């Protein structure tokens, strides 16, 4: 007897954008989440947090490797609990990512560093781990490097509209700014100022973002306004 089976599973594919809710934990402690109710349970300051699902463009390194692999095997509406080893999260801690700088280099710029502080140096975020004898040691490893992580995730929906896909790319890659749409053209408006100094986007960054928008939407032109 021949049986006819029908499967309605629709797993994710690279190049698709999805909205995802998640709770990330390390050793049982929450380090990031998008679910307000859980944040309130943990006693976190919900006033300063954003509780919207994040946009993830699959195949473009929007999230860590282990999380993306799990999402690829899920479908819209599905929830899952995932354990991710350090190798597929933020990698192992690397001693080569620790550097020592002369303390006077910071003093000359009017910066007083203290252990535990985070600084941006040469476009990299680092944490001051020690200070003494005229030297400052900075750790450029990701704070979660070397850590096994646990995630609860839910794929909320698939993002289909071109404008929303472009907005998702902007949010992930830049974190601020806005988009203006005019027919087949997208303009990325970037006016980010910090302490009176304008921070321009590098040509490499612009080209990468331009390629992602053109590849994953039907827009034909991407411009930048700074």
Predicted feature descriptions by range:
Residues 5-226:
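FKBP-type peptidyl-prolyl cis-trans isomerases
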């Amino acid at each position: 007897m021949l049986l006819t089976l029908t499967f309605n599973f629709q797993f994710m594919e690279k190049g698709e954008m999805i909205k995802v809710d998640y709770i990330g934990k390390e050793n049982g402690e929450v380090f990031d989440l998008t679910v307000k109710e859980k944040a309130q349970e943990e006693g976190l300051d919900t006033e300063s947090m954003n509780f919207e699902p994040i946009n993830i463009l699959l195949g473009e390194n929007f999230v860590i490797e282990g999380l993306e692999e799990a999402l690829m095997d899920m479908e819209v509406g599905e929830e899952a609990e995932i354990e991710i080893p350090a190798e597929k999260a933020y990698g192992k801690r690397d001693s080569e990512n620790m550097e020592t700088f002369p303390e006077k280099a910071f003093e000359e710029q009017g910066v007083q560093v203290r252990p535990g502080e985070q600084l941006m140096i040469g476009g990299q975020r680092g944490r001051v781990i020690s200070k003494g004898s005229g030297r400052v040691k900075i750790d450029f490893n990701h704070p979660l490097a070397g850590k096994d992580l646990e995630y609860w995730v839910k794929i909320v929906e698939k993002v289909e509209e071109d404008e929303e896909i472009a907005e998702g790319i902007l949010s992930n890659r830049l974190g601020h700014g806005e988009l203006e749409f005019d027919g087949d053209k997208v303009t990325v408006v970037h006016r980010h100022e910090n302490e009176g100094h304008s921070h321009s986007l590098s040509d490499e960054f612009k080209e990468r973002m331009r390629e992602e928008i053109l590849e994953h939407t039907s827009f034909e032109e991407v411009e930048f306004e700074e």
